[in-house]
Each structure stands twice: as C-alpha cells, then as structure tokens.
C-alpha cells in the first residue's frame, strides 16, 4: 500500500506522452489464446492489471516474452486442460472473464474463479454467459467458480445483446472468430478498444466486418495466425490529463492521442472554457480557463461521454462558477469519490443517479481514500487545485490504469510524490 501527497495551487505546464490503452491491451492480450502462433503486441502500458493478466496467461501455459519497452510476445502453443489460473488474481480482475471463450474454443472445457475488479455497482457477468451459451457452451456456476464445456466446435449465431456491454461484446467476438459458420452480433458496444481488438484479430486472419459499429458480422475460420500489432493510445488517460490542465488553469501538450476518440471530452472541456488546439495528426494543446463554467454531463456508451471520465470531471466541476448536473447512466454506484471530495470542501448532493455540484472558489487539502481506479485519479486532480496538501490513500487502485502518473505530473511541474504507508 502507498499514498500520494499532492501540494496544490500550481498551474501545470509541460508535455505528456499518452500510453497505450489499458482497455484495449487486456482483450488483445487474451486474444493470444486464440492462436498457437506468436502474437507480438506493441505500446503495452506497464500497469498492474496488465501484469496480472499476463500472470493468468502464464498459468494457462502461454509463453510470455518481454521483447522491449512496451512490447511483449505471447505464444499459446502449449496450453492444456491442466492449468490453474490463480484464484486471487482472477477474482480481483473483472477482465479475467475473457479467458473463458478462447480457452473453451481451444480446449473444449474450462473452469475458472468468478471474476472481480473495481467495486462499482453490479458489474454482472450474465451477458457474457448468455453469449457463450448461445454459441453452444454448457455453463455451470458453483461455489464462486464458472465451469464451461463444449462437446463440439462452437457454431455461428445471430445474437442481439439485451443491453450494450463492452465486456460481453468482446466475449462474443472471440467466440465468433473461431466458430463454425457466420455470426451476426447486434447492439454491440462501439468503444474504440473493441475496434482495436477487431483490427488485431483481423490481422491474425479473422474475417470481421462492421468494426466500430453496433452491428458486427464475423465468418469463423478454423485457425488464426500470429501477428504484430500496436495498441491504440488511452483516451481515458488523455482525458484525465486534459482535466489536469483545466483544473489548474495550466497548459499541457498531449502527444499520441486520437482526436475522434476524445470528441465528447473535448466538447465538454471547451464548453467549460478551456482552449484546445490540434497541433498535428496526434498532438493537442489544452489551456485551462481562469473561470471554469459549469456543465451538464450524462455518461453513456461510446461515442457519448464515458463513465470512466465522470469522476475526473466532477473534480473539475467542484470549482466551477455555478451549478453542474452530472448523471451516471452506466453504473448505479459510481459516486464513492463524492464523499472524499466533500472532505476537501466540495458542495455535492447525490440524488439517485444524479449529482448536483455547486462550485466553490477553492478546495482544501485533506486526507482522502481512493475507492476505485477513476476515483483515485479524481482525488489527485482535486488535490492539484486545492489549497494545501492532500494525501490520497490506497493508491494501488491507480496502478491498475495509469502508467507513471506521478512522473508524468512531475514533468508538468506538479508538486506530487508517492510515499509508503
């Protein structure tokens, strides 16, 4: 366990290189299980979630080689039914559910612990299991374990998701690429990270059309090849540092970004008064306004405003000149950071899924506790703008999704340091 000390009141100025997207890296790493050939992945962020997923794959018999900085080579030519993914890691990682489909396709049977992750609402796995069953899998739930088997090759299906789900869309895509026949998936999540997975699978030999849309068509192939693939930059990390500039009235240049992935965040930041300029194909400069204007924000599936930036924008709205309304439509329990922001002087009232944020002139440093990944960084952002020193505890959450955050902030003259508890 460790904490981060933040001394606020300093405008951030500098340049930050955005890392590879965690939410693309994890499913692409898992996709290596679909082939016996080597998959080389570039632009892989150094995060605890990535390390945990690689550890799970090693336990399944995958050969993992660190080729260089941000590059790994995965070869799943020696997996068998005699594997034992570590329960403690599987249970704490929601993304571990994705290993079910490829292992079932390769081995015909699999048994893993039920997955975990951030304690945010009812992140259920029923949509994943419904998709697996539709493809022909037999599923049994017993004592916090999931057992699955398939007596023959999975078959192509026409399937419409009851609700938009990033995770379940990924599970279904991985089933379909090796299933017998054609698959049509409707009401798919359209996140860029899903498209990135599809482009990687296509490079491995998968037959996928409709990438990036709500309707994806896949014709199954008998086997996939190896490939060399680079992960897209992390739009949530980019959005977080954009808020860092806005909340400190600073000026930051971000490199390695994809503008269209940031459209909803850029629109809201401009409405708040920030000035954002595109520099070239993959760089932008954001300059925060002296007076932050209030916003109305509703989280929704991509391409609308992402739930993973809700907490960061709430910190920004805490010092806006007026009243902001933030509505969380994705998860029913993603306001745990609110109580910590209130300790810092924020004026926030929760009404079911809606947060009414009345801006104050200044936040004040306090000892606060991170409850999940995005909450942890929202408290760091609040500390950057606050008067005095903020201590953010339980920063292991941050390590799940932000590569070298302290160092990147320090490069922009932030007074921030990590300390052991």
UniProtKB/Swiss-Prot annotation:
Modified residues (2-(S-cysteinyl)pyruvic acid O-phosphothioketal): 118
GO biological process, any: peptidoglycan biosynthetic process
SUPFAM superfamilies linked to this entry: EPT/RTPC-like
Enzyme active site: 118
Residues reported to bind phosphoenolpyruvate: 22-23
UniProt-listed Enzyme Commission number(s): 2.5.1.7
Reactions it catalyzes: phosphoenolpyruvate + UDP-N-acetyl-alpha-D-glucosamine = UDP-N-acetyl-3-O-(1-carboxyvinyl)-alpha-D-glucosamine + phosphate
Domain of life according to the entry: Bacteria
Example GO molecular function: UDP-N-acetylglucosamine 1-carboxyvinyltransferase activity
GO cellular component: cytoplasm
Pathway in which the depicted protein is active: Cell wall biogenesis; peptidoglycan biosynthesis
Subcellular location: Cytoplasm
Function recorded in the entry: Cell wall formation. Adds enolpyruvyl to UDP-N-acetylglucosamine.
HAMAP family from the UniProt entry: MurA
Similarity-based family: Belongs to the EPSP synthase family. MurA subfamily.
Name the UniProt record assigns to this protein: UDP-N-acetylglucosamine 1-carboxyvinyltransferase
């Amino acid at each position: 366990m460790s904490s981060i000390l933040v001394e606020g009141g300093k405008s951030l100025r500098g340049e930050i290189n955005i890392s590879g997207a965690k939410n693309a890296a994890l499913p692409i790493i898992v996709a290596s299980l679909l082939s016996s050939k080597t998959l080389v992945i570039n632009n892989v962020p150094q995060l605890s979630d990535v390390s945990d997923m690689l550890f799970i794959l090693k336990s399944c018999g995958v050969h993992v080689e660190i080729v260089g900085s941000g590059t790994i080579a995965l070869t799943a030519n020696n997996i068998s039914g005699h594997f034992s993914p570590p329960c403690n890691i599987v249970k704490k990682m929601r993304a571990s559910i994705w290993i079910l489909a490829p292992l079932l396709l390769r081995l015909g049977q699999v048994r893993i612990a039920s997955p975990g992750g951030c304690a945010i609402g009812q992140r259920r796995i029923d949509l994943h299991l419904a998709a697996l069953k539709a493809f022909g899998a037999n599923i049994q739930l017993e004592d916090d374990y999931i057992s699955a088997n398939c007596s023959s090759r999975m078959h192509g299906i026409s399937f419409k998701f009851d609700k938009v789900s990033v995770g379940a869309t990924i599970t279904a895509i991985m089933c379909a690429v090796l299933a017998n026949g054609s698959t049509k998936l409707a009401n798919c999540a359209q996140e860029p990270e899903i498209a990135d997975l599809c482009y990687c699978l296509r490079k491995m030999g998968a037959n996928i059309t409709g990438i990036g849309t709500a309707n994806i068509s896949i014709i199954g192939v008998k086997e996939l090849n190896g490939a060399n693939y680079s992960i897209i930059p992390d739009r949530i990390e980019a959005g977080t540092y954009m808020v860092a500039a806005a909340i400190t009235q600073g000026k930051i240049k971000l490199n390695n970004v994809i503008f269209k992935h940031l459209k909803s965040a850029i629109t809201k930041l401009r409405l708040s008064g920030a000035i954002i300029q595109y520099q070239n194909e993959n760089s932008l400069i954001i300059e925060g306004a002296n007076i932050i204007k209030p916003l109305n924000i509703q989280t929704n599936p991509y391409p609308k405003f992402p739930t993973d930036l809700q907490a960061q924008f709430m910190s920004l709205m805490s010092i806006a000149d007026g009243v902001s309304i933030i509505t969380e439509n994705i998860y029913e329990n993603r306001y745990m950071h609110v109580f910590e922001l209130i300790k810092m002087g924020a004026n926030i009232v929760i009404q079911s899924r809606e947060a009414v944020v009345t801006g104050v002139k200044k936040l004040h440093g306090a000892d606060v506790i991170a409850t999940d990944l995005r909450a942890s960084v929202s408290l760091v952002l609040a500390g950057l703008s606050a008067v005095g020193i903020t201590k953010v505890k339980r920063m292991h959450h941050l390590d799940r999704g932000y590569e070298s955050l302290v160092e990147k902030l320090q490069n922009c003259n932030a007074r921030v340091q990590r300390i052991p508890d």
